[in-house]
Design a protein with these regions (language model features):
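Bacterial N-terminal signal peptides
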Residues: 8-21
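A short, polar/charged loop/turn motif at coil->beta-strand junctions and beta-hairpin connectors
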Residues: 8, 48-52, 158, 280, ...
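Predominantly soluble domains enriched in secretory-pathway, periplasmic, or organellar proteins
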Residues: 23-472
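Bacterial N-terminal signal peptides that target proteins for export
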Residues: 1-9
Length: 892
């Protein structure tokens, strides 16, 4: 049943009223779907986005940075679209799209050569976009390992000139360094470039690309700022480790200082005196909070402000002494939970107003700047995750780059078109142009921004437990009793609601997008009939790198949000081994297991954030272990293959299942289910099922149509049967009476959905779950985490789970203890993809060849657009690929 969307009037009213008349009850349960309604966006992270000012949408963009020319007449941005976008800040109109110059030459070449040989793989790095002081040059840090140089003509048109290579690095998976922040000398003759992987700063002759000097700085330098004869460099990971430092992996084999949870513990600002000749050491290093990033210099050059996105703090440095003289918070109140994530700074022309982009709050904080007495004046609503700022003094406009703009859904008007749907790869960043507000206007904007964040719920989330409360499925306050003693939290891989449950007539599904319906997934269909069907639940992330972070920590850090620029340091979702382990990626507020352990709860992890390998127990056997070998070993009970897992986050080591397979699509999920059921029996014998069990069940990702792997339908059927077997085992165990099972996808990127790119399948299974119910309340991954926290007596970790809607509507009391019985699969689990040469259909044969080349050994390394086309054709036959999703792809 396909339902049209509507937005409750109360939600839109939040944007037009003050907070004084709002209480937490006004935010209780939203039933609207995620997506755009007019100029507003309902996000899958509990927030409403209603940006102030004029908006310029950048389809496919994710703009990472802004550069404003000295005369204020040109604004430039860049993101993941392999180009510059030049804009007139006065009108908000695009002036020019500029290709990035070739990276093949290190010397200046005629502009025409650079244009004809444009670098179509280059894209904006984490940071680094600067005009020369005279406005005739523009420099862009390219994530692939060079600096792109552009000329700017008198008529304000750009031309790509040449690229400046930076020295290589010798890392396990990368030889190109990663340029980030850029500063340009006052005379334009030198540029200063931070190298994010080698932890260095380069001084480069602008005309020739010659490296003049090199300095060591801190870990993962991001921004560079020139102040007189000194250079300031912000370092995401703080000081370089020394002997005795407690360290953890920080991507690409690098290390950073960490805390007891293996999460990055500090940031820093390196100070370099340019007048010190050839000395390569920094002059000083100022330690601030983790994820040090944005820098801004007051117009008089006296005060440097540095933002720590990992602590929500801003530090004011006196450039005469290089001492911190003030630290203040970007949050509305200092006692608020983590979650502002200040990621960009800008001063007004007089230096009396400081603007700060609070990425996680979709707002620009406005401060009255007075060192030692800085005061928050209010918040201006921006787009989704503002990450760059510029203040245009002539028109008094605040220019904001919004990383996620107004969401992935750029074609909402086509909702009723046949076969219409959304996919998370429909990126859409934006720029906002906001007139400097008056005092009264700022007050109204502040009320809007806080209402958009459901801010009153932060206070409610911190209320103490009340005495003498009877146990309920989901307590209203952390610490109040729950009927549940155990939670099992299962993460699956990459499916949308419509792909699996689009054929369920009682829910809001589109059967034309359902390629793994009841024939393939009979257990999931039986579960939603016997328990509850959730048809308005969403993943919070786009893909595995941010998806697993949202699913486990209820937030994605600034580091992860910027990482979409090529994932140059790591792909931090687990399953990658050393090169995916990255303490800089993780939330300073920790993961759900950190929360549980800190409050005395027992935890066990079956695969999440672990990396595994398999080998023959008999070392003389040299046969390659394929799916066929694993299936034979499992189905035949041979037990000749050993599986071992290592934690990707060191603090998980005592709590992981070591005889385990995490991400390995050659290992069937029914193997994982069987191993878990063995462990469950041991738990029963010892009566010690952990309070929190985390489980990664990944095979619904599929291997495409790769020969030697099961067909897509077989792998999804395998995942379905394993899920059903786990539920069956738990529901027939002694723990059933006080156990709740949650299951959700990590992200929905490998599919299509007619409601939202983020909508997914979710399951709430327990004796207290409402039976035979359709739940239309809007939930997301943070809702699941908030509900888990309330069940286990845990406080929220950050502002996102604190303001999430608990899943009260999914439960009832008294309970129904009827157990679940799994049903057998309809699709053989070992139904294999044929060899390409045996496929008669030319397109399907091409798909098989393409699948063979997809890098499926680790999560999300293949082109998802190609894989989605392959899955569609493999499962939907001759039905045309959805028109909304068509784009030119190279299926070869």
């Amino acid at each position: 049943m396909k339902r049209k969307s509507f937005l409750p009037l109360v939600v839109l009213a939040f944007a037009a009223c003050g907070l004084k008349n709002l209480c937490a009850d006004d935010f209780a349960a939203v039933t609207a779907p995620v997506g755009r309604v007019g100029a507003a966006l309902i996000t899958p992270v509990n927030q409403l986005v209603t940006p102030a000012g004029a908006q310029l949408e950048l389809p496919g963009g994710r703009p990472q940075a802004l550069a404003l020319s000295a005369d204020g007449k040109l604004l430039v941005t860049a993101g993941i679209t392999h180009e510059l976008v030049a804009v007139d800040p006065a009108t908000g109109k695009i002036l020019q799209h500029v290709p990035l110059p070739s990276g093949k030459t290190l010397e200046p070449v005629p502009a025409v050569d650079a244009i004809l040989d444009a670098d179509e793989k280059a894209q904006m790095s984490y940071a680094g976009l600067k005009f020369s002081p005279d406005g005739t040059r523009l420099y862009l840090a390219n994530v692939s390992g060079d600096v792109k140089v552009f000329s700017v003509a008198k008529d304000k048109t750009f031309s790509p000139l040449f690229s400046i290579a930076v020295p290589p690095v010798n890392l396990a998976k990368r030889t190109n360094d990663l340029p980030t922040g850029i500063a340009v000398a006052a005379d334009g003759k030198k540029i200063y470039v931070a190298l994010n992987l080698s932890n260095r700063l380069l001084e480069i002759e602008a005309a020739t690309g010659k490296i003049l000097r090199t300095w060591n700085v801190g870990v993962a330098p991001l921004e560079v700022l020139l102040a007189g004869h000194k250079i300031y460099v912000s370092n995401w990971g703080g000081r370089r480790p020394v002997a005795g430092s407690v360290t953890g992996p920080a991507g690409q084999g690098t290390r950073a200082r960490v805390d007891a949870r293996s999460i990055a513990s500090e940031g820093s600002v390196s100070v370099i005196d340019l007048a010190a000749g050839q000395v390569s050491a920094m002059t000083k290093e100022i330690v601030i909070g983790p994820h040090a990033g944005a820098l801004a210099l007051s117009p008089n050059g006296r005060w440097l402000v540095a933002a720590s996105a990992g602590s929500d703090l801003l530090s004011v440095v006196d450039t005469r002494s290089d001492e911190v003289v003030e630290t203040f918070t970007a949050r509305q109140n200092p006692g608020d939970l983590f979650g502002a994530q200040p990621v960009a700074l800008a001063f007004d022309a007089a230096g009396k107003i400081l603007f700060c982009a609070n990425g996680s709050q979709n707002a620009v904080a406005v401060f009255q700047f007075a060192p030692r007495e800085t005061k928050l004046l209010g918040l201006i609503p921006a787009g989704w995750f503002p990450c760059a700022l510029a203040f245009e003094a002539h028109t008094k406009k605040i220019c904001v780059a919004n990383l996620k703009g107004l969401g992935a859904q750029t074609e909402k008007a086509k909702l009723d078109a046949p076969g219409f749907g959304f996919n998370t790869h429909q990126h859409a960043g934006s720029l906002s142009f906001i007139a400097l507000p008056s005092k009264g206007e700022l007050k109204t904007m502040t009320a809007t921004a806080l209402a958009n964040l459901r801010y009153p719920l932060l206070a409610q989330a911190k209320l103490p437990p009340r005495p003498d409360r009877a146990p309920v499925p989901v307590p209203e306050r952390a610490g109040e009793p729950s009927v549940f003693k155990h939670v099992i939290y299962i993460l699956k891989e990459n499916r949308t609601y419509d792909q699996i449950l689009g054929d369920v007539t009682t829910g809001n599904g589109d059967p034309t997008l359902c390629n793994f319906g009841e024939r393939v997934t009979p257990n999931q269909h039986k579960l939603v009939r016997e328990f509850a069907l959730l048809d308005n639940t969403y993943c919070s992330g786009l893909l595995s790198a941010d998806g697993h972070n949202w699913a486990d920590s209820a937030i994605a850090t600034d580091y992860v949000e910027r990482g979409f620029a090529g994932w140059a340091r790591s792909y931090p979702c687990g399953g990658f081994g050393e090169n995916g382990r990255d303490a800089l990626a993780y939330s300073p507020a920790g993961f759900i297991w950190d929360n549980a352990l800190a409050h005395g709860k027992t935890v066990h992890d079956f695969g999440e954030f672990t990396t595994s390998e398999k080998h023959w127990k008999n070392p003389t056997v040299k046969t390659k272990i394929t799916f066929a070998e694993v299936w034979k070993d499992f189905a035949g009970g041979e037990n000749a293959i050993a599986h071992t897992a290592e934690p990707d986050i060191e603090t998980l080591r005592p709590f992981i299942e070591t005889d385990w397979s995490s991400w390995d699509l050659d290992v069937p999920d029914v193997w994982r289910a069987a191993k878990f059921i063995q462990r469950l029996k041991a738990y029963e014998q010892q009566d010690n099922l952990p309070a929190l069990t985390i489980f990664w069940l990944p095979n619904d990702h599929t291997s495409g149509t790769k020969a030697g792997s099961p067909k897509p339908a077989a792998q999804v059927a395998d995942n379905d049967l394993a899920f059903g077997q786990i539920v069956e085992a738990v529901s027939h165990s002694t723990f059933w009476k006080d156990t709740c099972i949650f299951a959700i996808e990590d992200d929905p990127q490998n599919g299509w959905d007619h409601v939202s790119a983020f909508r997914t399948t979710a399951y709430v299974i327990s004796p207290f779950t409402r039976r035979n119910a359709v739940i239309g309340t809007q939930y997301n991954q943070t809702s699941l985490l908030r509900t888990v926290e309330l069940m286990l007596g845990l406080p929220p970790m950050n502002q996102f789970d604190a303001t999430a809607t608990p899943m009260f509507d999914c439960f009832t009391n008294p309970p129904d203890f009827t157990a679940f019985n799994a049903v057998t699969n309809n699709v053989p689990l070992d139904e294999m993809n044929p060899a390409a040469k045996k496929i008669k259909n030319a397109q399907l044969r091409q798909d098989a060849l393409a699948s063979a080349r997809l890098p499926l050994a680790q999560p999300d390394q293949c082109d998802e657009n190609v894989l989605n086309h392959i899955l569609w054709r493999a499962t939907m036959g001759a039905q045309p690929y959805p028109a909304w999703a068509v784009k030119l792809v190279d299926d070869d």
